Amino acid sequence: MFAVIKTGGKQYRVAADDVITIEKLEGVAGDKIEFTEILMVGVGADATIGAPFVEGAVVSAEVVDQGRAKKVIAFKKRRRQNSKRSRGHRQHQTVVRILDIAAAGGKAKKASKKTEAAAEAAN
């Protein structure tokens, strides 16, 4: 089973036990995270595409590490002016391990219990 998740303004295709590097998320190593912005869920050639997200689909993950990316150098030079400027930047990143992909019904079960309790209270 695979899913396409959206986090940090980017899209990632993930499967169970994948380890991916994404934009920084709050948390320390060992924390559990749930991604709810799921764009697509599928098994093999069979896939469910959301509009824009798949209702009730949840991807569970665990934070493995917090770190920083390789340094990116921004260099500006003005020719014949003996003027140059160099600046470096390192983006913060989070490494996560995908634990489980729950298709439609992963989080909806909790909501359906509330609606059942509300229906019983109304009767």
Swiss-Prot record:
Keywords: Ribonucleoprotein, Ribosomal protein, RNA-binding, rRNA-binding. SUPFAM superfamilies: L21p-like (SSF141091). One of its GO terms (biological process) is translation. It comes from the Bacteria. It holds the Pfam family Ribosomal_L21p. GO terms for molecular function: rRNA binding; structural constituent of ribosome. InterPro entries: bL21-like, bL21-like_sf, Ribosomal_bL21. Part of the 50S ribosomal subunit. Contacts protein L20. This protein binds to 23S rRNA in the presence of protein L20. Belongs to the bacterial ribosomal protein bL21 family. This is Large ribosomal subunit protein bL21. It comes from Sinorhizobium fredii (strain NBRC 101917 / NGR234). The gene is rplU.
